């Protein structure tokens, strides 16, 4: 399949064959094709497979070994050297402990965002530099561009796969040293390229969920590290209608897994989580996916991370932009104002199931400005 792609290092005066790029090889199709495209453009390409989870779990071990074998097969096919590295200690200290602390506080964190900031674009980048890399590359569906001397993060071309949401906490210095070879390609084309070149990963299923949980049930996994804290499920009026095993097992907007079924004297409509009351250990549920208590107009965040501080809005006056409060959500118009080192975002339209612990990520057009962890929500 012929594909025209602009050079990946347009601002680097060196020819491609003098530039070393180390690709983060996950054993999936996206990183495989990223390595292939770099190789085709003449870069000196190497791969690195990182192991970020060391807990003794048979299923996870088998998955990691399969991924490593697939990464090795692709590198052999492309005639590039594959390094391996174990970053499990750094992952535990900088990602997993935060994940547990957030769940203890009954919030719903996004460890993938922290993994990108702390591991893939920090530990991996530093390690690759020691191996002689001029740049690292990953299989993320996102792009970068230059503006006024700054490296900006842009959405990937494929709207169904854009991963800028997960990268908003990374800094511009890291992006300046990173290449995203498939950012201008749509996923079906990536698979077609891999199949045409005979890469073993061409039809491999995309990984989903949190990397260290794998295919296990989330509740079973969490119980391994955090003790259950049973409490009661109540409706919006405080009437008890069931029991829960722990607020940490539930998230705002959740429908499945509540275990309350039909409630005598109530309609058959499904129940949804509307609130988690930490002080009383009560899980508040409401009926109907459009119940008013599931919606909010405003959120506040923790410390705001602007990818390009020099280009960031001062917020000395209200700033208009779009936002996502979860991955794959269509962008929503909002107005930002300063709130300490965070922001207050007021949305034009009520937003459903905005969840403390998740991230609000802000955009201007296809430029990702940055984001922050959601602290509170409010209904006007």
UniProtKB/Swiss-Prot annotation:
Region (Interaction with target base in tRNA): 110-112
Localization, UniProt: Cytoplasm
InterPro entries per UniProt: MnmA-like, MnmA-like_C, MnmA-like_central, MnmA-like_central_sf, Rossmann-like_a/b/a_fold
One MF annotation (Gene Ontology) recorded for this entry: ATP binding
Principal subcellular localization: cytoplasm
One family name in Pfam for this protein: tRNA_Me_trans
Function: Catalyzes the 2-thiolation of uridine at the wobble position (U34) of tRNA, leading to the formation of s(2)U34.
UniProt similarity note: Belongs to the MnmA/TRMU family.
Protein name: tRNA-specific 2-thiouridylase MnmA
Record lineage: Bacteria, Pseudomonadati, Pseudomonadota, Gammaproteobacteria, Cellvibrionales
């Amino acid at each position: 399949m012929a594909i025209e792609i602009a050079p990946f290092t347009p601002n680097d005066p060196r020819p491609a064959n003098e530039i070393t790029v180390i690709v983060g090889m996950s054993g999936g199709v996206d990183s495989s094709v990223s390595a292939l495209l770099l190789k085709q453009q003449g870069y000196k390409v190497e791969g690195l497979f990182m192991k970020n989870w060391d807990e003794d779990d048979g299923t996870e071990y088998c998955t990691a070994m399969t991924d490593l074998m697939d990464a090795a097969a692709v590198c052999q096919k492309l005639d590039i050297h594959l390094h391996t590295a174990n970053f499990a200690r750094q992952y535990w200290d900088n990602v997993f402990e935060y994940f547990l602390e957030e769940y203890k506080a009954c919030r719903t964190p996004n460890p993938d965002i922290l993994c990108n900031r702390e591991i893939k674009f920090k530990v991996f980048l530093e390690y690759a530099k020691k191996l002689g890399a001029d740049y690292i590359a990953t299989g993320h569906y996102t792009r970068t561009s230059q503006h006024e001397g700054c490296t900006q993060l842009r959405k990937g071309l494929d709207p169904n796969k854009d991963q800028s949401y997960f990268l908003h906490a990374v800094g511009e210095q890291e992006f300046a040293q990173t290449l995203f070879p498939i950012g201008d390609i749509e996923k079906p084309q990536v698979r077609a390229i891999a199949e045409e070149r005979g890469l073993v990963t061409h039809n491999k299923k995309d990984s989903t969920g949190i990397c260290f949980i794998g295919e296990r049930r989330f509740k079973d996994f969490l119980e391994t590290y955090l003790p259950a804290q049973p409490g009661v499920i109540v409706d919006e009026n405080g009437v008890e209608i069931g029991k829960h095993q722990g607020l940490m097992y539930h998230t705002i907007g959740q429908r499945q897994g509540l275990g309350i079924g039909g409630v005598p004297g109530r309609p058959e409509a499904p129940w949804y989580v509307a609130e988690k009351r930490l002080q009383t250990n009560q899980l508040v549920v409401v009926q109907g996916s459009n119940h008013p208590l599931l919606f909010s107009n405003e959120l506040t965040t923790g410390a705001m991370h602007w990818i390009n501080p020099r280009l960031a809005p001062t917020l000395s006056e209200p700033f208009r932009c779009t936002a996502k409060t979860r991955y794959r959500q269509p962008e929503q118009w909002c107005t930002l104002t300063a709130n300490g080192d965070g922001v207050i975002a007021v949305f034009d339209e009520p937003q459903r199931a905005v969840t403390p612990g998740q991230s609000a990520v802000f955009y201007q057009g296809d430029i990702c400005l940055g984001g922050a962890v959601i602290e509170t929500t409010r209904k006007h």
